């Protein structure tokens, strides 16, 4: 199983980029959720169940997808100089 790295950028299999802010736990069920921010548009904050965030792309539904996982960690150099 993959490990989520906080404060790192992930690419969604449909192409957009997101910053993982934290892992949150549901107060009633204890289920874990990934808290992530859109790096486009309004930069809003979103949550998704951890197991869904780490799931593989359904290649039957998306046969042309090049990613193996729904979200994949990106190695992005600093953009501070740009």
For each of these PLM feature ranges, what is it?
Residues 1-82:
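Mixed-charge, low-complexity intrinsically disordered regions
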